Curated annotation (Swiss-Prot):
Its EC number is 1.3.1.-. CDD domains: OYE_like_FMN. Pfam families: Oxidored_FMN. It comes from Arabidopsis thaliana (Mouse-ear cress). This is Putative 12-oxophytodienoate reductase-like protein 1. Putative oxophytodienoate reductase that may be involved in the biosynthesis or metabolism of oxylipin signaling molecules. FMN binds at P14, M15, A16, A47, Q89, R212, G282, G303, R304. The lineage of its organism: Eukaryota, Viridiplantae, Streptophyta, Embryophyta, Tracheophyta.
Amino acid sequence: MKNFNLTHRIVMAPMARMRSYGNIPQPHVALYYCQRTTPGGLLISEATGVSETAMAYQNMPGIWRKEQIEAWKPIVDAVHSHGGIFFCQLWHAGRVSHQDCQPNGESPVSSTDKPFADDPSNEFTPPRRLRTDEIPTIINDFRLAARNATEAGFDGVEIHGAHGYLIDQFMKDSVNDRTDSYGGSLENRCRFALQVIEAVSKEIGPDRVGIRLSPFADYMESGDTDPKRLGLYMAKSLNRFEILYCHMIEPRMKTVSEIFECRESLTPMRNAFNGTFIVAGGYTREDGNKAVAEGRTDLVAYGRLFLANPDLPKRFELNAPLNK
């Protein structure tokens, strides 16, 4: 994977833990990640907020303050001491938030001011639509967070552009109802995502940057009427920045909890993207191996299986029984 010498194709997928009290990662996190580290293995951190307005859930980690950077350092060092390659997932929740999680109790920001249609428990506060002149500030938050991640020792960053969070809220036409240069056409809807990629790549170098996308998913009421076109456009557009990898969620994962029968495939996106391609979404040992053997991906990310089996690469190697 360019400058990174991987010893296997199994990636630890990003998984939120919500144990970073005060948005500061705690010392015990080092054990959690080290248990899942192998020499030459790639791990992607839990979603990490790029700013105070990026937050959505209680006790999620951030990386916009000095004390957060300092708290991450021994955790990253511990992973490196076990030979792991560690990327920080940079995240902004957008409208998937409540005012209690926002500074001064303000409304969360988004590409839109549309509230969730299905929110019977009022879990989410109706969002405030970002003004066009505010968007560069959010882009800069991602840039600074990437700089902070490298200061903390991370090998690189993954931009969270999936699962209905802010970047996805701009890309998906079921959410984005803007009439400015960030809404309407596919090119306009993807503009924000690509500007974030450009800013982060210029800050830390494209060889240290990846992005996670879920064009086919309809999570957090963020679906698209033409997900294949969206995925292909993004895969092709990323090439001009020469970033390290593109991490895509399988079409069968319309939500984060169910696997659906699906005829769609990520193969067109895999063929369109020039860098390392990572797939995720309901993979087993067998179909992960098959996907690699058939050239449909370079790497396979596992979430739940890695959570239940910290030694997942060894179990896969031995074809040993797995905890569920």
